[in-house]
A protein has these predicted regions:
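Short, well-ordered beta-strand elements
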Residues: 4-12, 33-36, 53
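Short gly/pro-enriched beta-turn/loop segments at secondary-structure junctions
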Residues: 2-4, 122
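Detector for C-terminal structural segments
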Residues: 13-28, 45-164
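Short helix-capping segments at alpha-helix termini
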Residues: 1, 27-31
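Residue-level "edge-of-site" marker
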Residues: 10, 39, 60
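Early extracytoplasmic/lumenal segment of secretory-pathway proteins
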Residues: 32-45
Length: 164
């Protein structure tokens, strides 16, 4: 097992509670994680410079596809510009092949699963913690507003103001 592992997570104030919870879980595993709350501007410049050993980033994908979640931030040509600094040629090759796979959804899915395994279980470049629950509230006179997995479907809304 690991011994004498220590890391520092520099986080913004809004992530302090999450970082503190992670700190407690890691302590149980024998890993010391120091939590340092820093100003958002300092955090942003530190991330751009690649000087954050560990941090917490909230990100909500634009659409539910593995490509959007992994290629955008972790493909080596994109990673530095996104403040991630990840580079793994095997991961890149899987991403490239998956992006070029057309008409074979099962093969494409398997390639993304392999890439995800490398990213989150071999290299630990990212450790997804949770997806926040989306809330949607509408008055009774608003009909056909729907909440999908990741997006609001607002294109077919009916509003009957006479029932207001």
């Amino acid at each position: 097992g690991l011994t004498n592992v220590e890391l520092t997570a520099k986080v913004r104030a809004k992530e302090e509670k999450i970082a503190t919870a992670i700190q407690a879980y890691l302590k149980e595993a024998g890993i010391t994680m120091n939590v340092e709350v820093i100003d958002n501007g300092v955090w942003t410049s530190s991330r751009s410079e690649g000087s954050l050993q560990a941090t917490i980033v909230g990100w909500f994908p634009l659409y539910a596809d593995a490509d959007n979640q992994m290629y955008t931030y972790y493909y080596s040509e994109n990673a530095v510009g996104k403040g991630v600094f990840y580079n793994n040629p095997e991961f890149d090759a899987l991403m490239t092949e998956a992006r070029q796979t057309v008409g074979d959804d099962a093969k494409r899915e398997e390639l993304y699963k392999q890439a995800d395994y490398i990213l989150s279980r071999e290299d630990y470049a990212t450790i997804p913690l949770y997806y926040p629950k989306l809330q949607f509230v509408a008055k009774p006179y608003v009909k056909n507003a729907k909440l999908g997995n990741l997006v609001y479907h607002l294109y077919n809304i009916d509003i009957d103001l006479s029932k207001k």
